[in-house]
Design a protein with these regions (language model features):
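Extreme N-terminal tail/first-helix region
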Residues: 1-19
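Short glycine-centered helix-capping/turn motifs at secondary-structure transition points
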Residues: 162, 178-180
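Short helix-loop capping/hinge motifs at secondary-structure junctions, enriched
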Residues: 59-60, 133-135, 181
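A glycine-rich, hydrophobic loop/mini-helix early in the fold
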Residues: 48-72, 76
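Hydrophobic residues on conserved beta-strands that form the core of alpha/beta folds
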Residues: 25-27, 39, 63, 77, ...
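Unchanged
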Residues: 38, 47-50, 55, 81-167
């Protein structure tokens, strides 16, 4: 049996193209495993967290918000970017409270998600929240959204049939279904 090839690409040069509040775009020249050179366009984005929050009736808190990039309203789990140095659990709890007003008694990890590892450097941390107590939303000034409650089985169906195409939502719902036998 042949030894597996070392698949590592080595960065040779980096050119910074854009630096914004939440992302930086680079163009990197790399050395490929075969010794040739190639160019990689890279978007470094701050990490984020998303929460699959279930109420006492096993309904999912779904955030409906307009996504400018796609020009439409999407159904998603409560989520957001982590503050610099912020622990993923702390950030996820903060986002859940800000967007829905919910605070959970039980909070479990559902793993991580790499949304587009070919060019996009972001890790999303996924969590499950149960035993919810509700207070007021604490939305950011530029945040406009509606919160709906959708039965968990309906969310599974909507994720599987493609009605919901947000990666973090699909991943968290299906992981919860399989891992926790919900």
């Amino acid at each position: 049996m042949e030894m597996p090839m070392d698949l590592t690409e080595v960065k040779l040069r980096r050119k910074d193209v854009f630096e914004g509040k939440i992302m930086t775009v680079h163009v990197d020249d790399v050395r490929l495993p075969n010794g040739e050179e190639a160019t990689r366009e890279v978007v470094d984005h701050v990490d984020g967290a998303a929460v699959l929050a279930l109420d006492e009736a096993n309904r999912v808190l779904v955030v409906r918000q307009y996504r400018y990039v796609f020009g439409k309203v999407l159904d998603e789990l409560p989520a957001g970017k982590l503050d610099p140095g912020e622990d993923p659990v702390t950030g996820a709890l903060r986002e859940l409270k800000e967007e829905t007003g919910a605070e959970p008694e039980t909070f479990l990890p559902l793993g991580k998600l790499l949304p587009a590892p070919g060019c996009y450097g972001e890790t999303l941390h996924l969590f499950l929240a149960k035993g919810l107590k509700f207070n007021q939303q604490q939305l950011d000034p530029d945040e406009f959204l509606n919160v709906e409650r959708v039965p968990f089985d309906e969310m599974v169906h909507r994720c599987v049939n493609g009605e919901i195409d947000d990666a973090k939502t699909v991943a968290a719902v299906l992981r919860a279904k399989v891992l926790l036998n919900l």
